[in-house]
A protein has these predicted regions:
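Signature of N-terminal electron-transfer/Fe-S-associated modules in redox systems
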Residues: 1-164
């Protein structure tokens, strides 16, 4: 059995060793669970379910608590993301400026919905609830870069970028 993560194959024993190494780097700080989960996601491209019991054991918390935190926060993925991650703001300010139409156009252009990755692995589409760019609504974020005043032209550019 192996895990597919960010284009590399990860064996369970390798996953355990890499998880333990991440815990060792962050385990001595106060409140280490969130930093460990961030580091695990950076290491694997997502938070593998198999890493959660290892984290729970090391931090002396229940498996349910580790799982609950990992699934509560939207930034933690349970599967690898596409090569690009496109986040579309769905907060009130963006909705009032047409984010629903933007989302519909993007979904149609990419052929995927929210929380989905294109079959070719090019892009993952995620909703986000406020990028802090309300004055330039509707807004989006592509690979960490914020884009304001998203319109049909911007959508064409975004789709072209993620399809390269």
């Amino acid at each position: 059995m192996s895990l597919q993560a960010a284009g590399t194959e990860t064996q369970p024993h390798d996953l355990a060793a890499r998880t333990v190494a991440v815990i060792a780097e962050h385990g001595s700080i106060e409140g280490p669970l969130l930093p460990i989960l961030h580091a695990i996601q950076q290491e694997f491209g997502f938070v593998p379910r198999a890493s959660l019991p290892i984290i729970a054991g090391a931090l002396n918390i229940s498996n349910a608590e580790a799982h609950g935190v990992a699934t509560f926060y939207h930034d933690y993925r349970s599967a690898p993301a596409g090569r690009h991650v496109l986040k579309l703001c769905q907060a009130e300010a963006c909705q009032s400026m047409g984010s629903d139409k933007v989302a519909a156009m993007v979904k149609q252009a990419l052929g995927i919905g929210f929380h989905e990755t294109a079959k070719d692995g090019s892009v993952t589409l995620e909703p986000v609830y406020c990028l802090g760019l309300c004055a330039c609504a509707p807004s989006a974020m592509l690979d960490g870069e914020v884009i304001g005043r998203v319109d049909a032209e911007a959508i064409e550019e975004i789709v072209a970028e993620v399809r390269r």
